Every structure is written in C-alpha cells, then in structure tokens.
Amino acid sequence: MSDGKKKLSFLTVISTIICVVFVCEAAAPAAAIGNQQFFWWIFLILTFLLPYGMVVAELGTTYDGEGGIYDWVRDGLGDKWGARISYYYWVNYPLWIASLATMFPDILGMVFGVEFNLIAKIGIDLAFVWIVYLMGRSKAADSEWVLNGGAIIKVAVAVIVGALGIWYAMENGFANDMSAATFLPELTNTNALGYLSIIIFNFMGFEVICTMTDDMADPARDIPKAIIVGGLSIAVIYLFAGFGIGAAVSADSIDPDYGMIYAVQTIVGDSMIFKVICIAFLITLFANMAAWSFGVNSVARYAAEHGNMPKVFTSMISDDDMPNGANLVNAIVASLVLCLQLVPIDAISNGVFWMLFGTSIVFLLLTYIPMFPAFLNLRKNDPNRERIFTFPFKGAMMKVMLAIPCIELILAIVATLIPFSVDEIGDKVPMIVIFIVLLLIGEVVRVVSAKGRETECKGLTPELAAQRLAEESEED
C-alpha cells in the first residue's frame, strides 16, 4: 500500500537498529568486566538476545501499531502494566540524555586543551539537551541522514578503536593477562558483575523500529530480517571494540565514563587521530538520542491517549504528526536533572554520568520484564491472528526460553543497584535513592493519569481478540 509518504528503505531500517541499539558510550563499562566479557557476551547473545529478538519480531509483525512495546503490554496485561512500562520507558530517556550531556564538556576539553568551570559545563550540557530536542522534532522518514550517518560513524569509531587496540597490543603487548582462565566468568567479582547490565542494555532497542511501521515500505518483511542482521552485526561490533579497549587498557583501569576515549588516548596520545575520534564520538551521541526520541515519544503519546500518561504528552502535535509536547517534556526534565551537578556531594557531583546512566539502564531493563508474560497472554488469548513470524518454541520449552531473559533482567537490575561491597556504597546509594523516588513518582503519575479514563483495559480476552479481528477484516 502506498500513501504517497516517503518510506524508510531496508538499509535505513538496518541503520536505525544500529543507530538505536549500538551505543559507543556503553562499550567501555562492558570492557571493564575484563576478558570474561567475551564469555558473557556470547552467553547473553544465546540466552537473552535471541529470545528477546524473536519475541520482538513476532509482536512487531503481528501488532503493527505505533505504540510498540506499550501496545503489546497493554493488550497482554492491561492498562495498569501498560501505564507502568510507558513511564519506565519514558523516564529512562531524559536520564540518558542528561548522562550523555555530562560527557560533552570533558571530551571537548580533551580536544581543545581547555578545562571548563562548573557553570560553563552546565551550559554545554544544556546546549546538548536542547539540540537533541530540536532534532527530535523531525519525523524518522525525513531524518534518514541522521539514522544512516549516525550508524556509519558509530561503526567507524568502533572499528577504528578495535583496530588501534590490536595494533597497540602487537607493538607493546596486551594490557591484560590473556591466559585462558581470564576468559571464564568470575562470579565472586561483584564489581565486574555490576556492569553486566551494560551488556543486556546493549541489546535493547529493537522494538523502536516497530514504532516506525507506518514509515516502512514492508514492515512484515523488514522487521524480522533487520533484527537478525542488525543483532548479529551489533554483537560483532561490540566484541571488536571491547577487545580493542581491553588490549590497550587494563580492566581495573578502564573508566566507565570515558573508557573508550582514554583507550584511544593511551594508544595514539593527543594526536589529530585522537581529536577526530573524540569529535566523531560526540556526533554519535546526538544521532543516538535522535533515533531513540522517535520511539520514546511515540510510546509516551500513545499511552497518554489511553489515559496512561499525562495529557501533556499528546500536546503540540506538529503538522507531520510529531508529538512535540513529549519532546519538550524530555528536554525540560533532562535540564532539571543536570542541576544535580550543583549538589555539593562528591559521589553525586563527580559521579554524575554513571549515576544517571546506571539509573537510566535500570528503568529501561525494568520496562522489558512485563513484555514476556504479555507475549504469553497474547499467544493464549489471540490465537487466531495471523503471525507472519512466529517464536520458534512451543509449550514448556517456550516458557523456559521466555523465563530465562526475565530472570537475567531482574539479576542485572539487582547487580546494578545493590552494593555488594563497602567500596560500592558511595556510588550506588545515590542511584538507589533516585530510582526509588522516580519509581514512586511513576505510581503517582499512573494513578493521576487514569482519572481521565472512562474505562480500564484489563488486557485482551479471547472474546475481545475475536471482536477486534472481525472489525479489522471489515475495514479491509
């Protein structure tokens, strides 16, 4: 069907996945796990990425609304959980924007050899936030240059970092012990396990392309293929970049904030290559936030239309149907969060990147847990709907394959938030406080938003599913 609108090509769909899912800033915390990161990457590809990707492929090709994961959870579990995950999905985004904004002043300082004071830093942070806001006002199909360009630059940065790391190791030897034993998981290393959530986080985002179905030429064909091709490509890119970082910098010295940048600086010094990679890295941050804004804003808007998020998220709809109200709220919240840098507590003001980024990750991971039981309910209550792509397991095996990623998500959240040693208390307590406060705010938002709702959806029943199918067939 052609409606005369510009459509996303399959190449752009792949680029969108890479632009959304692959985030350069997450490579360093994963590399901080040490050589055992390779075990965990392979293990989580098999036990998390594959079942998660196949669930998203089935849901995305079966239910093609622009609400994405929100629609799936609402249909599977009802308004209560639909409201919760829409809030979790949304609140992760301004936290993420704010965390990335804090990287800009320091990296610019490395490039130009200057050191910014706190006021100048916050000014640069805010400039990043509001440029992202302006980029988020453009529809996905009209921003192919952002998606394609962002993907190309991200891959280029990762490949260059990996190649430089290998070259450095060949010239100077590996910075880490490369014996076989170091590649096995060390379950007693609680500090390293705290970064496992980063690897799972690095797989998140495939569902964002499912909110762009109206912009795709053939979503039923493109979504499953893009998830498979994009997922495998991203895993290879991460492993290569992580190897490069680990080759040049010892695991216990990798900075979770600027690890990739410091690795390049260790290899090539303050050369022009270093400066170019720094600038390219900063450009990828803009591309990443722009790509995510399309999905996050659509979910927030859809939820608000059902009385599951505040009405402000349905305001300021542009001529090309962009929810600019949601976009504006993102920028305002991110700007306010950045003021935490003014708090005169060292663990907060100096550890702001990981505090915000880690909390963002927790909320994003929390979003996906209800998706798996919702998937089971939709399979049970909507069995007659045509499924172009089908999750390949059935019965008890299917339940096991869905339970494993749920358990991994819960464990990753616990490992990120809970301090398992005295040394972690100072860094993790602020994260716990922010998480609890935002979680409680989310419950208030859910209850208040529901007051304007005339009826409550309890999730699809077999009768409602049959009725919906009949209505859709009449429309066709």
Tell where the protein language model's regions lie, with residue ranges.
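Membrane-helix boundary/coupling elements in multi-pass transport proteins
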Residues: 88-102, 203, 208-215, 271-311, ...
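Membrane-interface loop-to-helix entry segments
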Residues: 119-174, 187, 204, 227-232, ...
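Loop-to-transmembrane helix boundary motifs in multi-pass membrane proteins
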Residues: 2-11, 124-126, 217-221, 225, ...
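Hydrophobic transmembrane alpha-helices that form the core helical bundles
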Residues: 31-32, 51-129, 134-137, 282-299, ...
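Helix-loop-helix junctions that connect adjacent transmembrane segments
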Residues: 36-39, 120, 148-278
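Membrane-interface "cap" regions at the ends of multi-pass membrane proteins
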Residues: 1-43, 49-57, 63-66, 180, ...
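TM-loop-TM module centered on a large, flexible mid-protein loop between adjacent transmembrane helices
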Residues: 71-72, 78, 110-114, 228-290, ...
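Terminal cytosolic tails of multi-pass membrane transporters
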Residues: 1-7, 372-400, 419-476
